[in-house]
Structures are given as structure tokens and as C-alpha cells.
Amino acid sequence: MRKERFKLKIFYSASFLGFLLLLLNSSYLASFGTPSLFYISNVFIHILIGIGLIPFFTLFVSRSFADMLHIGKIAIVLLITGIISGLWLMVVGATTPNRWLLISHIVVTTVGSILLILHFIWYRVSFIRHSFTKIAGVTLAVALIFPVVVKIYRNYVPESDYLVQNPIHDIPTSMYEEGGGTNSPFFPSSAETATGNLIPTDFFLTSKTCAEKGCHPDVYRQWNESAHHFSSFNNQWYRKSVMYMQDVNGIQSSKWCGGCHDPAIMFNGIMDRPIRENMHTPAAQAGLACTACHSIERVKDTMGNGGYTIKYPPLHDIAASQNKVVRKLHNYIIQLDPEPHRRSFIKPFHRENTAEFCSTCHKVHLDKPVNNFRWFRGFNTYDQWQTSGVSHQGALSFYYPDEPKKCVDCHMPLVPSKDAGNKRGKIKSHRFVGANTALPYVNKHPDQLEAVTNFLQDDKVTIDIFALVNENKITAPIGQSNAKAFPGDDVRVDVVVRTRGVGHHFPAGTIDAFDIWLELKATDEDGKIIFWNGMIDAKDGKNGQVDPNAHFYKSHLIDEHGNHINKRNAWAARTILYSRTIPPGAADTVRYRLIIPEDCGKRITLQAKLNYRKFNWWLTQWSYAGVRDPDHTDFQVDKGYDNGKWVFTGDTSQVAGEIKEIPNPPIVVISEDQATLEIVQTDSVSTDSTELKTKSDVRDQERWNDYGIGLLRQGDLKGAEAAFLKVVKINPNYMDGYVNIARCRIKEGNHSSAEEVLKKAEELKQHLDPKDPNRAKVDYFYALTQKSQGRYDVALKHLRMASEQFPRDKRVRNEIGRLLYLERRYAEAVTEFQKTLEVDPEDVDAHYHLMLSYHALKDQLKAVKAQKLYLRFKLDESVDPITGIGRRANPYANMERQKIREHLSSIASYQY
């Protein structure tokens, strides 16, 4: 009997120790989620101990349940529930849709364990020594407190690699100091690997495995048709450009592209050889694979150029194992405990700093190792967003959305899915919808093309045929003011283009390669075309070049010899002939000159369209079939220029995509508008000398405001002020109307008059919510009026009010720093400019004033560094003469360069 009792005691004691060990194991699993073999081993240990304790637990319950206190019985019920939920988790897994089950398992087992140990302590169970109860209490306390301490520590001391922080003191003075420098195998890309070594190709060829076993099939299908998938040599436009780059500029410089376009071949060293040798390999066709974004371990800063560090996950060899048993075991572990997998592929910046994460590849500059010239801005989508109202970080926007938005809010919207990672039946779309209609067209992906088309047409940009201007008479809005004209009249039609659902400039990206233009057509009552600007020179009206006299939204870059940069040869760009974009929440006013024919009838119909073609016609022809003109042998070509001519007769049988001929990418009408002009005879109406004929109500407040914004941005300050005065006449309580009048007067230099209207704006500001983002602009512009009059203290007071609301607005910070410098408070000025650099390390105004401030402080070492950075980022005036060559070579581009211009009809019978 004693022997049996002793065995039973040993049995219970061993099971109790196993229970305590399970508590500690659970505490570790709750505290960490490390993608390591040690953590994975603990997951298995958790299962083994848990299953192993079931027989002991069953025997204990059968013998002791009847004699237990109520607290003990409750504990048993909870632990039984925990066992059932644990076994269920082993079958269905703890993926996001089953998160509730995991949480339930944790809660019931935790509470049950606490109650059971309390029962043991209070009831003094006979088979447990008193010392064991103390150990149990300590174990329970450790198991409960340890995860809490770890969570608090991580919250207050986040891992430094996951913080996106711009340098202040270590900003590179040249591209040679960026990334890993010249010793990096990936230079001149700023991208690096965690070890500095190459990464096996197979790592980037496993995207399809992400769809296996029902994990992420929807994500994979979406990505498979996206522009990210076709970022590399499976994209003919990119392929031709890089081949040309390697031919003209050398192989090394093409790595500058590789960090964001070709990680599969750059990180394995293949890009050290001509791409023609490997163009059709799986690695060259991989694009931006799942692992390319999700294995990024660190985002270094927001200076772009692929400024990230990528890490080969420690468990990837197991995931990619050729052994089916090992892979099945790996897949089961991911399903059972996805946390290590999640930690490997989802970093905090993937969720919290999404815009900064996107900046790594959506902000670009070139420098000497790439362009054999100097620092030159490529595109800068990140800063456009950061300084705008859309981010709620910019103080000076004309309009603000109710809530701030990031890149993913528009480009990765929530869509229905049953993928393992879904939350309440939704996932972030991995189509990355943007504006690339060309790739889904040539790849024959109708779903992607439809998604992109719908995205473009979803009120992202709108147009408004707004005003009729006849000499000094303005009739607006045309549709509500019974706009009239007379036969023979020479009138101007103003069309307003407004950005609404765009979080960056419209357009954005490599805008020199796009065809985005406004088209205006006028027809008489018989349907005869009497005016047409912006047509396409082709029989079908589609497959041809756009009317060069049209109003374009693009940039026109020129090379060292003044040639147009038309082959995506950005390394040869030396200056910009013109660049026309519209910031978020802003507008552009486009002017057309129309002569009313004598025989046009009683009415003229105006139709305006904002057209979009992803790649311009010439670039598409060149990308697919461009070869050197055999008749043009006397040409010059070097790294900085190409004077050669091209013909489009090349072989297209091996081009990327499903279409093996020169394609005709679709033209999408982003927005359109229509209006009617009434044509009356001279003797049927009385002469009216009124300068402004309008019929407006509160609904037209925004239309007039947009009209004024467009005129203001062009520099038509008087016209803009007249429009804004109309705005405040319609709605005297519209604060922004007065602010916009002040903008015009400040630009004119009429600061005292601007001060008067800003006082009215200040009165209206008092009625706004303290968090209303529109408040700060009143303080900013009022500060400018005070600064111009030497009232620096008042100006500083208002600027600090603006910066308190918008601490990341560079313009506000720089104004504060400038005033502090003028007041000879140099150390304080340095502090302000450093705050600017925390947001944008390439801000030229900040570096200029830091140079001045350090000189004033006699800190020559820092002054020299600031001077180097200022000279690096400032515009190069020495290239200005090149623009003259480009302007003479292209008179249409020269006209587009003008801030204010009138567009004429391009049809032959009305060519003036």
C-alpha cells in the first residue's frame, strides 16, 4: 500500500513538474516569435508536453475532481477547454482567421493554470510538498510577468533596425558614400545584404510556393499580374532601356537599377555580366518577388535609391528544401505557429512606416557613378506625398482629406479573400494598382487591366470646362452662366484640371516616358469639327503620336547635346526643359484660343478629355523594334549624349510579353467634361461692358477656387486674385479664400495688403477645430507678412504655432531657421535645420543655412561638410545654355515650357 502510494506520489509530482515546465515553455512562446530552430523546437516541445500530460491530467481529474474546491473545479473545466482548443489548433492551425481560437486557448489555459495552482496552495494537496507549492507560485509569477516585461521593453526600446531614421551628421557627400560604397558588390545601388555577401538565386524564385496549401493563393494571383512582378527583364520597355544603358554607359552603372528592378539577378552577382547572356533565365524574369520586399530587414533612410538591407531568412533553407518530408513539416509548423514566419517577412515598417518603406524605391537620384555628371534628381514620389495635405504633414496644402492617407491606402486597398492571412475576410491587395496599363495589356491580363483602368477613372483627377474669356470679359461657370459668343469672336476657353484622389503629384514616377495630355474638341451644331487640340496622328485615332501642340503632363529632359531624353536614358540627362505636374489637392488652368466661325450655327459643343497612355508612342516603337538607322552613319554617341537616328524595323519575335509585335497600349480617358456655347447674332443682344458675367452659388465656390489655384500656380496673380475674390463673395466664411488671396499678394510683394486679408482669415480660424489642418497655413503666411516688415518676433511666434501642428513640414522649419539666423541665434538655427534634415536629408535650403550658421559659429569643420552637401544638392546653373539647344530643336516643347500659354487648334483649316 505504501509502495503504491509512493508511486502515485511520484506520478503526480512528475506530472506537476511537467505542468510547470509547460508554463515556462508557454511563457517563452508568448514572449518571442523568433524565426530560429530554438523557437521551433519549443513549439514541438509545447505539443509533446501538452499531449504527454493529458493521461496524467485525466487520471488526476478522475481521482480528485469530486474532492476539489470550487476554484479547482473551475480550473479543471477551463483546462479541459484549453486541451480541446489546443488539439483543434493542431488541426486547423493558428493562422489569422483562427486567431480567436489561439487567443481563447491562451486565455482559458492561463486562467485555468492560475486557479489550479491557487487551489494547490490553498488546499495543500497531499501529494504535493509544501516546497513545490512555493516553486509553483514562483513559476506562475515568472510565466505571467516575463511576457509582459518583454512586451513593455519592445514597446519602449524598439529594435533599431526596424526604425526608419534619416541621418543628420552622416549624410553622404557623394554616391561613393552611399550603401556599401565602392566595395559593395551591388554598387552603385544603395541596396545591401545583411552579411554583405551574395544571395542564392532560388531565394527569389519561390513566389509560387507562397500560394501552396492555401496560404496566400489570392495574394499570389494578384501579384502575378502586377507591375511589381513585371519590373525586370520580363518587361520589354525596361529590358530595352537597360540593354541600351549597358551598351552606352557600361554594365556597372546598370546595378543602380537592379536594387529595385532586378533583385534576383543583382543579389546573386549575375548583373556583373551583360544582361543579354541571362535575359531569358528564370532569375531575369522573376521581377520583384515576394521575398524581395518581405525579406527587407532594414530601411536605412528616406533618400531612396534602393536604400535597404535585405536578409536571407535563417529558416529559408528548410522552407526551400527538396526533401518533401522536411517541407511538409515546415509548412505544418507555419500553419501551427505562423509567428516566426510573420516575423521573418513582416517587419514593423511594413505596417507602421509604409510610406517610408515605399520611399526606398519611389525616390531616386543619380550621381557621377551612374551619369558621369553630378547629383541629379530622378523622381521623388515620397517627398511629394510627405509635403502634401494627403499625409497631413504639409502645412500649406490647398485641400486636406478628412484623415491622412499613406501609399497603401490607395495602392493596396482591402479586398475580399480567404487567404490564411486575411483579417475579417479582407487582405491588402497585391495588384499594386497604379497607372501601368501597358503591362497588363501586353501580358494579356484583363483583370489587372480592368483594375488599373477603374483606379484611374475613380475621380483621381477631374476636369472642368470652366470659363469663357472674351477680351476682358469672363463668363463662368460656362454651364451655369448661359455662356454666349458671337460669330467671328476670338475667345479663350479655360479648362481646369484638378487632382482629387492622388496622394502625390499627377503624374508621378518616370513622367518623361508617359503620354498624358488634355484634349479639347469643339463642334458646331452640324457636328463639324471647328477646333481640335490634342488629337492623335493616326487613321484609327489611337496608334500614333499625340498632337505636339497639346497640353501635356510630363517632363522633357535633354542630354548634353540638347537631345530629347526619349529612351529612358536618364543617365544622360543634364537638365529639364520643362516639367508639368499638379500637386495633390491642387489644380492647373489650361487656356485654349478659339475663333468662332461665321457659319457655326446657334451653338458650339465643347468636349474635353484627360487622356492617359502609359508609354509614349515613340518609346513603345523603340522598345520593341528600335534599331539604328542604317542610313545615318555620321552620328555621335557617348555616355552623356546620343545624336543618332533610329528606325522601328527590328525583330520582335523575342520581345517580352504575350504580344510579339509592336503593341498599341490602350488610351484611358481619366476624366471628361462637356459644355455648350450659345452663338448669337450681334444685333440680337445689347452690348454689355461688364467685366465679369457669372451666375454662381455656394456649390461653385470650389470651382472658382480651383480656377484660381490653377492661375496662381501659373503666375497669373491678378487673374488668380480675382477668382479668389469671387470665392469669398460666394462664401464670406470660407477661410481658405482669404488665405489664397494672401498667397497672390505675397507673391506680388504686396505684404501689407496680404496682412489685411489674413486678419480676416485669423478671425475665421478661431471657429475651426484646434486639430483642423487648415489652421496652420494662416499662421505661416501671416508670418511671411511680418517677416517682410522686420517683425521677426511676431513672425517666429506664428511659425512656431504652425510647426506645432505640423512638426514635419520642412518649409515651416526652414523659415523658422532662417529667422533665427537673421536674429543671429545661430545655435538655435542649427537645431531647426537639423529637424528639417530628419525629414529630408537632401533639403538644399537646410544645408545652405547650416553652412552659413556653422561659419557664424566658427565651426569650420561642420561648415565645410554643410557646404559640400549644399553644392551637391543645389541646381547646376552651368547647364542652362543646353536648354537653348533643346528649345530651338523642339519649338513645341519650348512653348510648353512657358508658364502661361494659349493652345491653338491643330486641324489644318484652323491652324493660326
Question: Residue ranges of each PLM-predicted region?
Answer:
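Helix-start (N-cap) detector for alpha-helical repeat units in TPR-like alpha-solenoids
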Residues: 701, 735-736, 769-777, 810-811, ...
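Structural signature of tandem alpha-helical TPR/SEL1-like repeats
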Residues: 714-726, 747-765, 774, 779, ...
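Structural marker of alpha-solenoid helical repeat scaffolds
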Residues: 730, 764-771, 805, 839, ...
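Membrane-embedded alpha-helical bundles that constitute the cytochrome b-like, heme-associated redox core
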Residues: 1-165, 174-175
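Primarily the internal scaffold of c-type cytochrome electron-transfer domains
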Residues: 124-128, 133, 153-198, 219, ...
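TPR/TPR-like (Sel1-like) alpha-helical repeat modules
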Residues: 844, 848-879
